[in-house]
Amino acid sequence: MKVIFIAKKGAKRYSIKNSSLLGNCLFTINRLTYFAHLGNPQKVLNRNNTFTKEISEFIGMTSSSAFKELNHSLSQTIIGQHHLVERLLIALLADGHLLVEGAPGLAKTKAIKELSDRIEGNFQRIQFTPDLLPSDVTGTEIYRVEDGAFHFQKGPIFHNLILADEINRAPAKVQSALLEAMGERQVSVGKETFPLDKLFLVMATQNPIEQEGTYPLPEAQLDRFLMHVKIGYPNQESEHSILKLARAEQSQNDKVKETLEKISQQAIFEGREEINKLHMSPAVEEYIIHLTMATRQPAKYGDDLARWIDFGVSPRGTISLDRCARAYAWLQQKDFVSPDDVRAVLHDVYRHRILITFEAEAEGITTDQVINELIHRVPVA
């Protein structure tokens, strides 16, 4: 059922067309409750049927609920991997890239495909193999007889969402081509440079089980990723739900898939702006900096930390922690960033940026254990 109601902001009144699909927000006006669609600005009109800046701000105050609904929707199809789903949304909103490490069959591919079905954008999977060439990723120049000239044929990197499957199975040249595109947001071929879309997210995967014949990513390239997420097997209850979902999907295989309401790219960009403006107190900002400095000067926080940490976190890591903490807080529908939000994303942001010593490895100390010690020892300013 569609309802049109009047929303007030200051002395102005706006007519808002209701849509009871993804991204609904509850409003109570004159003791009556209505829903306003938040994911797609085209659903919001004023009396002249035009989208206005004022109504954008009105809707923007609660637009995080659209992404909360998106999180819930994805969790219904990606069962037992809530952490992965949440980190995927954080990477989307923080405008970064994700490195996911997990055994085969844990819904890594399914997660980003389901996300692509729910946002306005296109998706491409790149299977990394030892014989892959850089041009297979970025594209190549093709000679056309019609005009006797070379024309650039864009590769799969020119999509909004990219799955770089088993990135450590391709040679360093191919990895560098992808990581350069991730860092510079452009591809250079010959004398020409081609910009990538504003909405650009790469989710790269690694298989921790089979390491033979792989090309491990060096630390300098790992630093390009916003987060390094490790995922494990679902629990017994989730396994039951996965079986039920798989049977339901199999029985509906021949049926026409329901068209999902998509969140527009504009809504994503507006969400990013809100996240950048989220309030962060000087104490929380100092806490982020102290966490980074503790990885560079670990002796201040204990001789054992100094013995375990070889290289600390770069300034890019500090920036990444700030962006991820803001995005995490925003997804919780908070209007400020707390130390708990920083700690919630700390492992995924620092995991691939702290290099531990051989002595730590000999003692069986992992990077995650080092990060746990940082959380316990670094006080909030």
Spans of model-derived segments:
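C-terminal engagement/docking regions of AAA+ P-loop ATPases
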Residues: P298-A381
